[in-house]
Amino acid sequence: MITTGRVWKFWDNVSTDEITPGRYNLTKDPQELARIAFIEVRPEFAEKVRRGDVVVGGKNFGIGSSRESAALALKAAGVSGIIAKSFGRIFYRNAVNLGIPLLIGDTDELEDGDVITVNWETGEVRKNGQTLQFEPLPGFLLEIVREGGILEFIRRRGDLCIG
């Protein structure tokens, strides 16, 4: 799972309401959700994000309400994964359950607009010849992401057993 894309850098404490604001959050259609992603804080995001781009956050990315639509909107927008200093715990599981790879670590070296290559399995990020190391998902969660999310994992394997 290696991707190359542009960085969309965000700040600490990005809430699920900033990702998919409640007043727009009236649908479960992924493409509609992609169109409202970050609409109030980065209105250009939905139009300019490209498949493979990477969302980068600070501390507590995805805090707030448990709306799955926040992670679903980013997946539908084509984001290849999310790197942050830390994640809101419910957002973290929603992202994994939807098959979105996550990395944790110091994101200070990554800037908005950087083009990076990410190995989501090892946590290695390359930027302008520089290699940065992040913490990848632990084994079982990485297996879920590799399968495309929890539903696909269960469909292919028949249960949630490891091995």
From Swiss-Prot:
It is an enzyme of class 4 (lyase). NCBIfam families: LEUD_arch (TIGR02087). The keyword Lyase applies. Pathway: Amino-acid biosynthesis; L-leucine biosynthesis; L-leucine from 3-methyl-2-oxobutanoate: step 2/4. InterPro entries: Aconitase/3IPM_dehydase_swvl (IPR015928), AconitaseA/IPMdHydase_ssu_swvl (IPR000573), IPMI_Swivel (IPR033940), LeuD (IPR050075), LeuD_type2/HacB/DmdB (IPR011827). Disulfide bonds: none annotated. It comes from Pyrococcus abyssi (strain GE5 / Orsay). It catalyses: (2R,3S)-3-isopropylmalate = (2S)-2-isopropylmalate. Gene3D superfamilies: Aconitase, domain 4. Catalyzes the isomerization between 2-isopropylmalate and 3-isopropylmalate, via the formation of 2-isopropylmaleate. The gene is leuD2. This is 3-isopropylmalate dehydratase small subunit 2.
